[in-house]
A protein has these predicted regions:
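Acidic, glycine-rich loop-and-beta core segments that form the ion-binding/anion-interacting portion
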Residues: 139-188
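Acidic-glycine-rich active-site phosphate/pyrophosphate-binding loop
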Residues: 44, 122-123, 186-188
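Detector for glycine-centered tight turns/loop "hinges" at secondary-structure junctions
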Residues: 47, 103-105, 175, 183
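Glycine-rich phosphate-binding loop and adjoining helix at the ATP-binding site
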Residues: 49, 53-157
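Residue-level signal for beta-strand positions within conserved beta-sheet cores that form or flank
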Residues: 36, 89, 186
């Protein structure tokens, strides 16, 4: 199950019920579509990486990214085995919004990057994987990871800054990642 009993004998004798998340109860997959690389990882309920695959490219195209996913996913699932695969809840996908606007930043031909226009990333990943998909802006996803697993756990309200090829931001308000109406509230 998703929870397991974890209580000292003294509390058991008092009839207390203390439970914790069972790290083996649920598995999920995460996919990152980046400017120079893509990655797929399988994680447990605590966020620990169980297996992962990565590909590097000069610039992303829908064909490159989806071919990588189609080639990687079956091998990852084989590594996990039936017991773990049956516990997969879904796949989270993160990517920068409007990838077709990166022409200059990734030195890609216009025709290649325009292939992202109208390409429905969540629908393509759902069709390819057969899993439920949650799609989020890449920096909002990074903010979420910091909030769940990093120093962000210590604060209820903060601005998150990601500095890489570009500078992006995320917001945490009242202990919750705030994506905003458009999914990238922290963008600037």
């Amino acid at each position: 199950g998703t929870v397991k009993g974890v209580m000292p004998r003294s509390l058991q004798e008092m009839g207390a019920q203390i439970v914790a998340l069972n790290p083996d109860g649920v598995r999920s997959l995460g996919m990152i579509i980046g400017r120079r690389a893509s990655e797929i990882a399988a994680i447990d309920f605590y966020g620990r990486v169980l297996t992962r695959r990565e590909t590097v490219y000069a610039y992303p195209t829908p064909d490159r990214v989806m071919t990588f996913a189609r080639d990687s996913l079956p091998r990852m699932l084989d590594e996990l085995g039936f017991e773990q695969v049956r516990r997969i809840a879904g796949i989270g996908v993160s990517a920068p919004f409007q990838l077709w606007n990166w022409l200059g930043s990734v030195n890609a031909p216009a025709g290649e990057m325009n292939a992202w226009r109208g390409f429905d990333i969540p629908a393509a990943v759902a069709e390819m994987s057969g899993l439920d998909v949650v799609f989020q802006n890449d920096v909002t996803s990074a903010c979420t990871a910091e909030h769940l697993y990093g120093r962000g756990r210590e604060f209820d309200d903060y601005a998150y800054f990601f500095i890489g090829s570009f500078i992006g931001g995320g917001l945490v308000l009242n202990g919750t990642v705030y994506p905003g109406r458009t999914g990238n509230a922290g963008a600037f």
